[in-house]
Design a protein with these regions (language model features):
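Residues on the lipid-exposed face of transmembrane beta-strands in outer-membrane beta-barrel proteins
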Residues: 62-70, 104-112, 126, 155-161, ...
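Outer-membrane beta-barrel transmembrane domain signature
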Residues: 142-229
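Short glycine/proline- and aromatic-enriched beta-strand/turn motifs that initiate or cap beta-hairpins
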Residues: 22-80, 281-283
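Residues that define the transmembrane beta-barrel architecture of outer-membrane proteins
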Residues: 54-62, 98-106, 120, 145-155, ...
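Extracellular loop and loop/strand-boundary signature of outer-membrane beta-barrel proteins
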Residues: 47-55, 89-98, 140-147, 205-209, ...
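Transmembrane beta-strands of outer-membrane beta-barrel pores
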Residues: 40-46, 85-91, 128-136, 176-184, ...
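Predominantly the C-terminal beta-signal and adjacent terminal strand-loop region
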Residues: 169, 175, 185-187, 207, ...
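Outer-envelope beta-barrel architecture signal
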Residues: 28-36, 73-81, 118-126, 166-172, ...
Length: 283
């Protein structure tokens, strides 16, 4: 419990630093890249607290991203905000029961940018992520739902490559986010939410997490291409979230195909551009 409280304190401190860095970045550049993606795909959910069976089905997802350069390390660090909202409808293997799931995930990463060449950029740095959601199994009467609440510190890396096909500018991006240390809420094995919140008989419900008990990885692959003055973006997301705490196992595996658009904006003038000056572009 002391370790978990320590991690919570570190996360709170880092969050304050990140908010300061975001404010500081306003003075570095007015250029910002924003994108909005929507998509659908496959979901595999398993919650041993609710059922011994996996549930598989469809998922819908919304992603909003914002990136801009900061003044950190002589202006070579970019800040990235990522917001994921997804909902799933799944069945067990015999299709005799359904489960509903919903997650809200937010992350902020600071990437140091290495310009390998004029076309290739390597970015790496720390990341903070917060995740909230619920999985509902309509057949269970005593414990019909499992709350999802976890977050922590991790590492984030990105590769961006720009090229042309028939004089059409294209940008491909691969990103991987790896949680390293954090905290997670979980009931104990056989413990109900009534015992935790009504009877106040909760046990160890806030736990320390690491690669050992929460081995997770989120990967995103996108391709940008212009259509007139609009930058279209298509992508594929592989989101592997899993944990084993309090003798309870859980996982949510998502594979989604995304489509949307990206915008390069000069904030104070409201000017949208297909490209940015190379010295201030975060992407």
């Amino acid at each position: 419990m002391k370790v978990a409280r320590g991690i919570c304190w570190i996360i709170s401190l880092l969050l304050c630093k990140i908010l300061c860095a975001q404010t500081d970045s306003l003075h570095a550049t007015h250029y910002v890249m924003r994108s909005t993606l929507v998509g659908a795909g496959f979901n595999n959910t398993f919650e041993s607290y609710l059922s011994p069976l996996e549930y598989k089905g469809a998922e819908m997802r919304f992603i909003h991203e914002s990136m801009r350069m900061t003044r950190l390390m002589s202006g070579k660090v970019s800040g990235q905000n990522l917001l994921h909202v997804n909902a799933s409808y799944t069945d067990n293997i015999s299709q005799t029961n359904h489960a509903y799931g919903g997650m809200l995930s937010w992350s902020y990463a600071l990437h140091y940018q290495f310009s390998v060449s004029e076309r290739l950029k390597l970015m790496i740095g720390p990341m903070l992520d917060v995740n909230l959601g619920v999985v509902y199994n309509r057949r269970n009467s005593n414990n019909p739902a499992q709350a999802k609440a976890y977050g922590g510190l991790g590492a984030s890396g990105m590769l961006i490559y720009k090229f042309h096909i028939a004089q059409c500018p294209l940008t491909v991006r691969y990103q991987a986010d790896l949680p390293l240390l954090g905290v997670m809420f979980s009931p104990e094995y056989g413990e109900s939410y009534y015992e935790i919140f009504s009877l106040k008989n909760g046990g160890k419900n806030v736990l320390f997490t690491s690669l050992y008990n929460r081995p997770s990885l989120r990967q995103l692959l996108t391709l940008d291409f212009p259509i007139r003055r609009t930058i279209m973006r298509i992508g594929y997301l592989c989101d592997i979230q899993q944990a084993h705490v309090n003798k309870l196992k859980s996982h949510i595996y998502s594979h989604d195909f995304m489509i949307g658009f990206a915008r390069n904006i000069y904030l104070f003038r409201g000017k949208k551009q297909i490209s940015m000056p190379s010295k201030v572009t975060p992407f």
